[in-house]
A protein has these predicted regions:
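Conserved beta strand-loop-helix elements of the APE1-like EEP
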Residues: 44-59, 203-225, 251
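Metal-dependent phosphoesterases centered on the DNase I-like endonuclease/exonuclease/phosphatase
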Residues: 33, 111-213
Length: 253
């Protein structure tokens, strides 16, 4: 995290799968890096955090439909900018495992549906709004870099990440008025990914083998303000990294 901040100095950072409850979150260490922090965490599982240089004016934890024992997977903040309010959702979307899983796959579908309904009911697609994080879906075939045989096998066995049903859930985000910020700049790039399996050492291969499942989706007003976007392989290449590479988008806002 220190390396990422030193290199990019982001105004806003979203973390997913923090795996720590709120009481044990290293709040002081993060604040010493120069960031305000809003967390939604639980011990050993899930967990999300939004960090920002400027203090947010509003925030939300989870979704209105969440039960008391909901998995901690979503946090959103509202910031004031020179061009009005900016809403940022950071999510650790369920992975789903496979189509035939009786619990995880329906839970993933419900999470997406609940988020779409939440956006439609309480937020404006005309506003500056971002949905970002580990969405756990590759939107297009050019976002799949695990080899054609593996791609076919995953589809045949119903393994999650790019099933037709999952892509339909992403289409609902598009229908709300969101755009994949990376694809806005690179509509045909087919060899850049954000997740690389530890066990098969896909990051070390040439070409690298992975999936693009981490995204920043933005409303049209922000789409028109995109300056640049990329995935940071240098950070992913550090010693003992996450299996995900940082993804980022810069806006002229």
């Amino acid at each position: 995290l220190e390396k990422l901040i030193g290199k990019h100095s982001p105004d806003i950072i979203g973390l997913q799968e923090t795996k720590v409850d709120n009481e044990n979150f290293p709040l002081e260490a993060i604040e010493n890096l120069g960031y305000e922090v809003i967390i939604n965490g639980q011990k050993g599982h899930y967990g999300v955090c939004l960090m920002s240089k400027n203090k947010p004016v509003n925030h939300g934890i989870g979704m209105p439909t969440d039960p008391e024992d909901a998995q901690c997977r979503l946090v959103w903040l509202e910031y004031k900018t020179k061009k009005g309010s900016l809403f940022v959702f950071n999510g650790y979307f369920p992975q789903g495992e496979s189509r035939d899983h009786p619990i995880k796959f329906p839970y993933k579908e419900k999470f997406y549906k609940d988020l779409i309904n939440y956006l439609k009911q309480d937020f404006d697609p005309e506003s500056h709004l971002i949905v970002m994080g580990d969405l756990n879906i590759s939107p297009e075939d050019i976002d799949i870099g695990i080899g054609e045989n593996n791609r076919k096998r995953w589809l045949q066995t119903g393994k999650c990440s790019f099933l037709p049903e999952e892509r339909e859930w992403l289409e609902n985000l598009k229908d709300f008025g969101l755009y994949d910020s990376y694809r806005c700049l690179y509509p045909e790039e087919n060899n850049t990914f954000s997740w690389f399996d530890y066990r098969s050492r896909g990051f070390d291969d040439n070409p690298k083998r992975g999936l693009r499942i981490d995204h920043l989706w933005v409303t049209k007003s922000l789409k028109d303000l995109i300056d640049s976007s990329s995935i940071d392989y240098e950070i992913r290449g550090m010693e003992k990294p996450s299996d995900h590479a940082p993804v980022w988008t810069k806006f002229n806002i």
